[in-house]
Amino acid sequence: MGFPGVWMTESESLVYRVVPKCACSTIGQIMYYSDHGTYFDGDIHDSTQGLHKWGQDDSQKVIEAAVLDRRGITFTCVRNPYARLLSSFFDKIAGIQRNGRRYRGNLVPQLMQKYGIEVGSPEDNFDFDQIRSFRRFLLFARDTIRWRRPMDPDIHWSAMSGHISTFITNGGRYDQIFFTETFNDGMQKVLDAAETPVRVDVGAVPRFNESEGHGPKRAHKVSEYFDDLSRHLIWEIYKRDFQLFRYDFDDPDNKMPTGDIDLAEVHAKLGR
């Protein structure tokens, strides 16, 4: 099985299990900078050198050895499930991707046909009923996760606990898991614990939000997108995420965690 979704610095000082829609672009750029003293020119997801990635064949043995030998600081980052799913919708479904196309080719037309989702377009300034379309997208996301139809779950809206668990079940252990909502503090603690070739001041790092500006802005507060049925579906899909990572299910507008993550509990419950 190995360690899919893992990025590692060439110095082996930092090992990161990527969780999509949880600041992964910024984290990847910080890792790159911590080795090279400069940021990658472009989207870090497109890099093929300067940063080990499990998806690169020549990186797999290096990553596996470092993880199993417990070299470097191993970490990941999580985000409020309500906010993460909304971000996935506005970026991947309603937005235009960096290449000027819709995400996954015919996915959006398929959702328009089968689920009645509307997303607008740049020509009409993305004018559509955001709440109605998001709730229909949520039904689609639930169908992919529960029944794997009309397609397998996408990494951008499948549960964080699922991403994080593969690393544990295949023999890895996390040193730190921090919150997107307190990103600077959490990322700095990771860097302070690591021996990186280049020191990084997280407060001075620009934010590398690769999806910014390519789609509509969220027009309503978070809670307005989630009626009783929507919240029932969210609990069905993300129950473990709320519980393990201490997010407030009862108040969608409270994006902040309600407590600290218990790493021992995470390893015990996700390592089964």
List each model region and its residues.
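Membrane-interface amphipathic segments in extracytoplasmic regions
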Residues: M1-R272
